[in-house]
Amino acid sequence: LPIMLFLGAKHKEQIESMQKEKLAQNGITIVATDEDEKSPFALLPAINFLRAGGIVSMTGDRLWGEQTYVTVNFLGYEARLPDTPHLFALMTGAPLLTFFVFSDAEGIYHIRVSPGRKVCAATRAERKKAVLESVQIYADDLIRFARQHPFEWHHFEPFLGKKINAVGEKFTK
């Protein structure tokens, strides 16, 4: 199964020095994105890749440069999460899969993959809501994972925003 892996340019350099050729031999295409990249055309190869039946892997919890985002409820705080993976799923009809990697006490790594889900909108007017709902589902999955494996999720940049006022208040932004 062909895989396209989106990485920040600095991470690509690390991968290149170690494994780029081996990854390519195994059907993994590496796409390096620069933090200053603003052109939507940079994403076209991923759309075509998904439509051809491939898998595109990109981070769901880190904003890269000027990347677009939606604000969701994360443990009672605002959190800005990328909307790009969810837009890709909406535009292509490809299922969205969330995966988490963690190690156990013996140092063995495990991968947990969510059931695939579709991001659908019957009309153009419903797209924003569908993407927001999908990103909130991802945030809720991330919360569950972090609670189960509190030392396995790391975020090295400011992540939580303002506290959301009312407990149980539905957050819609």
Predicted region positions:
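Catalytic core of membrane glycerolipid acyltransferases/transacylases, capturing the structured
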Residues: 1-36, 52, 63-73
